[in-house]
Amino acid sequence: MGKIIGIDLGTTNSCVAVLENGQPKVIENSEGARTTPSVVAYMEDGEILVGAPAKRQAVTNAKNTIFASKRLIGRRFEEKEVQKDIDLMPFSIVKADNGDAWIDVRGKKLAPPQISAEVLRKMKKTAEDYLGEEVTEAVITVPAYFNDSQRQATKDAGRIAGLEVKRIINEPTAAALAFGMDKSEKGDKKIAVYDLGGGTFDISIIEIADVDGEKQFEVLATNGDTFLGGEDFDQRLIDYIVTEFKKEQGVDLKNDVMALQRLKEAAEKAKIELSSGQQTEINLPYITMDATGPKHLTMKITRAKFESLVDELIERSIEPCRVAIKDAGLKVSDIDDVILVGGQSRMPKVQEAVKTFFGKEPRRDVNPDEAVAVGAAIQGSVLSGERKDLLLLDVTPLSLGIETMGGIMTKLIQKNTTIPTKATQVFSTADDNQTAVTIHVLQGEREKAAANKSLGQFNLSDIPPAPRGLPQIEVTFDIDANGILHVSAKDKATGKQANITIQASSGLSEAEIEKMVRDAELNAEEDKKLAELVQARNQAEGLIHSVKKSLADYGDKIGSDEKARIEAAIKDAEEAVKGEDKAAIEAKSEELAKASQKLGEIMYAQAQAESQAAGEGQPDAGKKDDGNVVDAEFEEVKKDKQ
């Protein structure tokens, strides 16, 4: 059985890990980095760049470089958080036919799971290159406060990337696994995982217990905000710089996509620098121009100034902590350890706020960028049977129920219920002789049905006519270990049943997912062909260069016919290299190699003669010693050019 890898699919960065000989290993990508930017760029020629190469070209291709797409995954276009992002993002967020928020790239509408799938494919390839075998199964993490649609969309992204998602687990829970797995301290421990990432915030209260030699991780409560993260901190700084620049220069950078992209990079860098220094300078020459000429942006930002800009965001993260502790039935003083996860938790002011709230120093022995992927890999090893000393009990973050008479939400499963779980309740009809009922499934905490997230609806028909209140309709909610909901309704009189796996009232249909999987496979084939073409081109160019050099050095030692033949072969090869036909490039390279064979022989003879001439000056020149000559066959090793 192949390895089940662990993937932290982050808003800003992603990371992949695997368990080897019982130890988690974070795998470096092809650029040598342990984390990969969750950035995908769509080039004019159809090529798709992922990670650092995509991020590097963002300034010149801002409209087609997608970052933070996780903030849109499983979301409706109308949601206020999406509307807010429309004004901030350089790329175009559009309404899909099903009402979801999609992204328009070069005139083609793409679903956020398709974009996330490109990042997942890079993670899959990173693991395959390291392990030397195909990887088909993964555990993928999501923010604990993700709702059903967002979890389903993440699972879809895995499928599009060619991965069977064995389990979706919550990021703070994964971090707790990474933290608690190899801790030797005995006794129960209650920990708080404060996870402030690039786009989302989660707080989970988790109890780690030793039960008969088995480590049990039980999530007591979770809370969060799926639209609060490092991207928002960056945006506060960008807004401040734009406002100040407008005051000084009278130019509004908000309308200049390229300037904003440069500013985003600079703001992110400044934010990181301010975690260790008290002041930083943003220096962007030629940021824009007006009638008076080019404008340069130079601005000093102090740590105190930045902290004042984001103070309210940090405060926003503390309220969910209060709620989570209350929901867990604990006091702040009951928490034994606080773990910080997510890149934004490195900010000193964030650490200070966490320390003040919990009354203790957060732990420093967890890598905020890697802990989540490590935990996912540990869970993968449990699912594959490699580890048997661990039990994970997670919870559903939000209450689930159905809409009942008067537009009220009736809850069947309360938030923070341990999963997997099942709940059944009997309902009846609202009108006399009603022959059908619509089951409207909701997720959220509000009494008013319309104020909660609609997950989908389905009909149960052919109910025998009867006075209102008489028919008995049994509704069952079943949440699996991924936190994904299955709902069924049954008329107890007839036994007739209707059910759905919630794919959200929006979401991708099975046909759409399968089409995206096929497109992705097609893309992979195209990528392979492109790589082979580039390799053939590189080898041909290398040969052309070396033959040209040899011709310049030794051309006078061959006949004019021979020389003309080589020059013609060079010209043919140069023409072939300009084209897109791999077979033609290889054929013309072969012809050039044959045509230049005579030239190679002359070069070799010349080199040998020079070597002998040099050797004649040595004392033992001319002595022949065959005693230690080893017969060997030499094989030309063609090294692939990158």
UniProtKB/Swiss-Prot annotation:
* PANTHER family per the UniProt record, alphabetical: HEAT SHOCK PROTEIN 70KDA
Keyword ATP-binding belongs to the record: yes
Tell me where on the tree of life, at the top rank, the source sits: Bacteria
Q: What is this protein called?
A: Chaperone protein DnaK
**Where are residues bearing Phosphothreonine located in the sequence?**
200
Q: Which organism is it from?
A: Laribacter hongkongensis (strain HLHK9)
Q: Does the keyword ATP-binding apply?
A: yes
Q: Which Gene3D superfamilies match?
A: 1.20.1270.10, 3.30.420.40, Actin, Chain A, domain 4, Substrate Binding Domain Of DNAk, Chain A, domain 1
**What are the alphabetically sorted keywords of the record?**
ATP-binding, Chaperone, Nucleotide-binding, Phosphoprotein, Stress response
Q: Which HAMAP family match?
A: DnaK
Stored Pfam families: HSP70
For this protein, what is any one GO molecular function term?
ATP-dependent protein folding chaperone
Region entry Disordered, spans: 608-642
Gene label? dnaK
